[in-house]
Amino acid sequence: MLNTQRAQEIAASPIMANVTYQEVPIYIQHVDEQNETARIYPLDNPELEQDVPLSQLMEH
């Protein structure tokens, strides 16, 4: 599970972090602190953007 601060660090970093959503590698585009969600997309499908709870993201 990612906390808000770590998710923001990952989103701002130029270095790709190993983060998954439902076991799928994803890229974090934006973090919404108020709602504790992140806008993400799967690395293999950039068109599939979605907002998901930070609690469902895993850093490996």
Swiss-Prot record:
GO terms for cellular component: endospore-forming forespore. Disulfide bonds: none annotated. Belongs to the SspH family. It is found in: Spore core. Pfam families: SspH. Its main location: other. Keywords: Sporulation. Induction: Expressed only in the forespore compartment of sporulating cells. One of its GO terms (biological process) is sporulation resulting in formation of a cellular spore. InterPro entries: SASP_SspH. This is Small, acid-soluble spore protein H. It comes from the Bacteria.
